[in-house]
Regions:
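A generic structural signal for short beta-strands and their flanking turns/coil linkers
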Residues: 13, 21, 74-78, 92, ...
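Short, intrinsically disordered/low-complexity patches at protein termini
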Residues: 33-35, 76-77, 82-83, 99, ...
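Mid-chain, well-packed structural core segment of small domains
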Residues: 66-94
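Hot-dog-fold acyl-thioester-processing enzymes
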Residues: 1-70, 74
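HotDog/MaoC-like acyl-thioester-processing domains
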Residues: 1-11, 85-129
């Protein structure tokens, strides 16, 4: 794969997160924290307007943009922080930008935003080039 500093990739990784997506992720991950599937708990105990997606679901969706772009073998490291909750109905767009290349490894800044342009995931990946 040929990459150069400044190369970018942007993709909508999910249109309208559904409660079904969140519930399926809970089953796949084994994370049944009620904040993610029970409005009564999310609102009453958590003080949130509704349930919200697992951070790792958002990370996984963002990671799909990276592997679609770079290929699953090239991706060597990937880490993020969750900057805002992802709510049912949100549409997520992930963007990667090559910020450096050294010794055959590209460093890629990653940001995923919701439909309002608010960052929900920020991080960095490294890929073999």
């Amino acid at each position: 794969m040929t990459l150069k500093v400044g190369d970018t990739r942007e993709a909508v990784v999910i249109e309208k997160v559904a409660r079904t997506h969140i519930t399926k992720y809970a089953g796949a991950s084994g994370d049944f924290n009620p904040l993610h599937h029970d409005d009564t708990i999310a609102q009453g105990l958590g003080g949130y307007p509704s349930v919200f997606a697992h951070g790792m679901l958002s990370m996984g969706l963002t990671g799909r943009m990276l592997t679609d772009w770079l290929g699953p073998v090239a991706l060597k490291r990937y880490g993020v922080r969750f900057t805002k909750q992802v709510w049912p109905g949100d549409t997520l767009t992930a963007k990667g930008e090559v910020t450096a290349i050294s010794d055959g490894v590209a460093t890629i800044k990653v940001v995923t935003t919701n439909q309002n342009g608010e960052s929900v995931v920020e991080g960095e990946a490294q890929a073999a080039v």
